[in-house]
């Protein structure tokens, strides 16, 4: 209720201030009994105010500071600094990918389908493979498959660790199912021939 009360007070203040409108002396010819006209006052004729003067008065900046601020804003708007920021952001994201990958591989409570949804690939649907996050997901799945291959995990263990057993008949539609098929191929390829 308090925000509404504050907004109501602000609205009342604005309405009260609108009665103090400046009027040109040449346009107000007579005094009327109208309540609003009594509050009108004549505008003082002065030197033409520039918009910079208003900024200086409102913000307390001098002309040089305002000029520097405008120049920086123009550079930002033209995109010179944004390309530098984008490059820095891409570099930071690349360094963070390795950290996320190590964190996901270390944790036993993180599953591939969770990683798939955390990377926002679930929402993309069929176009997920063209996303840059899909490359990170592929790195994660390759590292996970390599780990299972090194430990010679059974296909049942991999099936359960991918939580495909909980999906039942819907397991082939899961994003983790192709990973299970890849593991089966490598598992049977590495089996000795009888």
Swiss-Prot record:
Residue interval(s) of motif RxLR-dEER: 38-57
Subcellular localization: Secreted; Host cell membrane
Signal peptide: 1-23
Entry keyword Membrane: yes
Annotated region described as Host plasma membrane-binding, given as residue ranges: 58-108
Consequence recorded when altering residue 180 to A: Impairs homodimerization and affect soybean infection
Keywords for the protein's UniProt record, in alphabetical order: Host cell membrane, Host membrane, Membrane, Secreted, Signal, Virulence
Keyword Secreted among record annotations: yes
Domain of life: Eukaryota
Major subcellular site: secreted
GO CC terms, sorted: extracellular region; host cell plasma membrane; membrane
Function: Effector that suppresses plant defense responses during the early stages of pathogen infection. Suppresses cell death induced by effectors and PAMPs in plant hosts. Avh240 dimerizes and localizes at the plasma membrane to interfere with aspartic protease AP1 secretion, which presents an effective mechanism by which effector proteins suppress plant apoplastic immunity.
Domain notes: The RxLR-dEER motif acts to carry the protein into the host cell cytoplasm through binding to cell surface phosphatidylinositol-3-phosphate.
Subunit structure: Homodimer. Interacts with host soybean aspartic protease AP1.
Similarity annotation: Belongs to the RxLR effector family.
Protein name: RxLR effector protein Avh240
Organism: Phytophthora sojae (strain P6497)
